C-alpha cells in the first residue's frame, strides 16, 4: 500500500473553508523563499524553441560550480526534485530493502512503495537503499557525514541545504551508489519553474550497459527552456545567494521570536521553515486561518506546527494573527 502523500500548500481548500480571496492570504505552509530570484528578461528562443544541448550544458556547468560538484560526478537536470524522486526507485539497483528514517518528506517512501521494487525496513544496517533528507523536513536534523556505507544506493536529499552549504555532503557524489538531490525552487523562490538536479557517479545515474538510466526515464527535453535559462543565470549569481542566506537567517530568527512570544516552543527547522511545538497544532492552525494565515500541520503529530517565512509585506499580518 502506498503511504499517503501529505504536503503543504492546499490554499484553495483553506479559502473554501475560511473565506477571503487568494490575495488576502499569507501562505506559510511551504518552505519556499518568499523573495524570489529576479528572473528578468529571457531570450525569445528560450520560450519558442526546444531546449538544445548548449542550454542544458550551461545549467549543468553553473550547477557544478555553485555546488562544488566533484569532477567524477555527473549532473542530471530534471523538472523538479520530485520528478527525480518518482523515478529513483527504477534506477539500476535491483531493488530490495529500503530505509527512510522518519518523520520526513513523505514522497520518498511513497515513491519507493509505488514502484513495487522496494520493501521498507526499520533497520538501516540491513537496508539496500538509504534515503536521508538533509537537512530534514520538518525538523531540520542533519545527516551524519559518516552515513555512507557499502549498499546499493544512498540518496541524500539536499533540497533545503542551500541555506547551510557548509553542511552539504556533495563531496561524496562521485562515490558509486551515492545520489545527491538538489532543488532549485526552494532557495531561489521559484518553485513553479520546476527545476531540480541529481548528482552522482556515472554508473549510478547514467549507466552505459543497457540498464535503466535517469536521463532515459526523464525522457527528451525534460526541463523547459525558461527553466534552463533562469537556472543557469541564478546559479552563477553567487552574490545574490550570499545576501539571501543572510536575510533568511535574520528572518528565521525574527519568526522564532514572534512564535516564542506567542507561546510556542522551538523544535527545529531550517532558515526556510521553522518547526514549533504547541499544545494543539489543529487549534493553532485554525486560529491563524481565521486571520488568513495558512500553516502546516502533520498527521503524525498533534503538537507540531510548521511555518515558512513571511514575505516583507506579510509580517504585519502574521503579527496581527498572533496578537
Where do the model's predicted regions map?
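N-terminal "arm"/small-domain region of PLP-dependent enzymes with the aminotransferase-like
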Residues: 1-55, 62
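Short beta-strand
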Residues: 27, 181, 265-269, 296-299
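Conserved beta-loop-alpha segment that forms the PLP phosphate-binding cup at the N-terminus of a helix
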Residues: 57, 72-96, 106-108, 196
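PLP-dependent aminotransferase class I/II
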Residues: 179-260, 264-266
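PLP-dependent enzyme catalytic core of the Aspartate aminotransferase-like
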Residues: 290, 300-323
Amino acid at each position: 500500500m502506498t503511504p499517503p502523500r501529505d504536503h503543504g500548500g492546499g490554499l484553495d481548500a483553506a479559502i473554501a473553508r475560511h473565506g477571503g480571496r487568494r490575495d488576502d492570504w499569507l501562505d506559510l505552509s511551504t518552505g519556499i523563499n518568499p523573495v524570489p530570484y529576479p528572473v528578468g528578461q529571457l531570450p525569445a528562443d528560450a520560450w519558442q524553441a526546444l531546449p538544445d544541448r548548449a542550454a542544458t550544458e550551461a545549467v549543468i556547468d553553473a550547477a557544478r560550480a555553485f555546488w562544488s560538484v566533484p569532477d567524477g560526478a555527473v549532473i542530471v537536470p530534471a523538472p523538479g526534485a520530485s520528478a527525480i524522486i518518482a523515478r529513483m526507485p527504477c534506477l539500476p539497483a535491483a531493488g530490495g530493502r529500503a530505509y527512510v528514517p522518519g518523520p520526513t518528506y513523505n514522497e520518498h517512501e511513497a515513491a519507493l512503495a509505488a514502484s513495487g521494487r522496494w520493501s521498507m525496513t526499520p533497520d538501516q544496517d540491513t537496508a539496500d537503499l538509504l534515503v536521508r533528507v538533509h537537512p530534514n523536513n520538518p525538523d531540520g536534523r542533519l545527516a551524519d557525514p559518516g552515513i555512507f556505507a557499502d549498499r546499493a544506493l544512498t540518496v541524500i536529499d539536499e533540497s533545503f541545504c542551500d541555506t547551510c552549504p557548509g553542511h552539504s555532503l556533495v563531496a561524496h557524489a562521485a562515490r558509486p551508489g551515492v545520489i545527491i538531490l538538489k532543488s532549485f525552487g526552494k532557495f531561489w523562490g521559484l518553485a513553479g519553474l520546476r527545476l531540480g538536479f541529481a548528482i552522482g557517479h556515472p554508473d549510478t545515474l547514467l549507466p552505459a550497459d543497457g540498464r535503466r538510466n535517469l536521463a532515459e526515464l526523464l525522457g527528451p527535453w525534460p526541463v523547459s527552456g525558461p527553466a534552463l535559462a533562469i537556472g543557469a543565470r541564478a546559479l552563477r549569481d553567487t552574490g545574490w545567494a550570499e545576501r539571501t542566506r543572510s536575510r533568511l537567517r535574520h528572518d528565521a530568527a525574527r519568526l522564532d521570536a514572534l512564535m516564542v512570544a506567542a507561546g510556542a516552543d522551538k523544535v527545529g527547522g531550517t532558515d526556510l521553515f521553522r518547526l514549533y511545538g504547541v499544545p494543539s497544532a489543529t487549534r493553532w492552525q485554525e486560529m491563524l486561518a481565521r486571520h488568513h494565515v495558512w500553516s502546516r500541520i502533520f498527521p503524525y503529530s498533534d503538537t507540531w506546527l510548521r511555518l515558512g517565512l513571511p514575505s516583507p509585506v506579510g509580517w504585519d499580518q502574521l503579527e496581527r494573527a498572533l496578537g
